[in-house]
A protein has these predicted regions:
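Extracytoplasmic small-molecule ligand-binding "clamshell" domains
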Residues: 36-118
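A ligand-binding cleft/hinge motif common to bilobed small-molecule-binding domains
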Residues: 106, 122-131, 180, 207-239
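Acidic, polar ligand-binding/catalytic clefts
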Residues: 96-161
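C-terminal motif of bacterial Sec signal peptides marking the signal peptidase cleavage site
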Residues: 22-26
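Periplasmic-binding protein-like
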Residues: 60, 140-147, 221-262, 281-288
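Bacterial lipoprotein signal-peptidase II cleavage site
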Residues: 27-38
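Extended ligand-binding regions for polar small-molecule ligands
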Residues: 28, 80, 85-89, 173, ...
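Bilobed "Venus flytrap"/periplasmic-binding protein-like clamshell domains
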Residues: 56, 75-89, 122-123, 140-196, ...
């Protein structure tokens, strides 16, 4: 073997060794699993209750205009439609969503949850933030008085006129807080659900109920005989109440869900869905 051949063989061995070292080094430092933190969030990367699925809770029952026909999986109704759009932004299809039901009070109580996010007109409050996380708001609403045309409340134009009238409201809600502040507690009846409050109005147990404005218009037009939206309560009409998704405290999904809501707001989807499902809810006088 000549000296030049020996040199060529040594150079080849050196090149192979260098290539092997580069390959091993690249493998050692390649991000895997949770180490690949700089990668964009995808369905597979999100931490959810059920792998590859997004579990969304809503009320039992869920009412229009928020959920049509108590069927959130249809993506019909404002909150159902927004939720399907949020899921899509997160990388989930409509079929990847698992819809479950939950009690309103338990959803905002401390402790573990068996869902990823919950949607049933939750207002953002500092007190609730101590127990759960909130996403960015997807809608801003006000609180309103709804009644029937034969009720003494139907002709009211001021808050003072309503203070001596039996009024119903659902417990542990922003509607209850506003009703308590504006109307006092002497004639305020508290119920476990809006369903119960509506039944009390229909039976004559109360003369009016307090609900958010879109729900008031829905009840007046589709549920109550000769229903009427008396007006908005003044304390809730300046700025309004921000509705958002509730997530378990410290959830890894809080930021991705907020980002999805923000993106839907920026691209006009939220406005479009609001017009489609809540478009007729603006014309109600503010009670003085």
């Amino acid at each position: 073997v000549t000296a030049s051949a020996r040199l060529r063989r040594a150079a080849a061995l050196t090149a192979v060794a260098a290539a092997t070292l580069v390959t091993l080094t690249a493998c050692a430092f390649a991000p895997t699993g949770s180490d690949a933190g700089s990668a964009p969030a995808t369905e597979g990367a999100l931490q959810t209750v059920a792998a590859g699925k997004l579990t969304i809770a809503t009320g039992e029952p869920a009412f229009s205009p928020w959920v049509e026909n108590d069927d959130p999986a249809s993506c019909q109704g404002f909150e159902a439609a927004v939720s399907c759009a949020v899921a899509e932004k997160l990388g989930f299809t409509k079929d990847d969503i698992v819809w479950v039901r939950s009690n309103f009070d338990s959803a905002i109580a401390p402790g573990p949850k068996d869902w990823d996010m919950n949607v049933q007109q939750f207002s953002i409050t500092d007190q609730r933030k101590q127990a759960v996380d909130f996403s960015s708001p997807y809608y801003t609403t006000t609180q309103a008085i709804v009644t029937t045309g034969t009720s003494p409340a139907a002709s009211a134009t001021t808050v003072a006129e309503l203070k001596n009238i039996p009024v119903g409201v659902m417990s542990a809600t922003t509607s209850y807080q506003v009703a308590q502040d504006q109307l006092g507690t002497a004639n305020l009846s508290v119920f476990n659900s809006n369903d119960d409050a509506v039944a009390a109005l229909q039976s004559g147990q109360v003369d009016a109920i307090v609900v958010d404005l879109p729900t008031a218009f829905y009840l007046a037009g589709a549920v109550l005989d000769n229903g009427k939206v008396v007006g908005q309560l003044p304390d809730s009409s300046a700025g309004g109440d921000e509705l958002a998704y509730v997530l378990p405290k410290g959830s890894a999904l809080t930021t991705p869900v907020s980002d999805a809501v923000d993106a839907l707001k920026a691209d006009g989807t939220l406005d479009q869905l609001q017009q489609e499902w809540l478009g007729g809810t603006a014309a109600a006088p503010v009670l003085k």
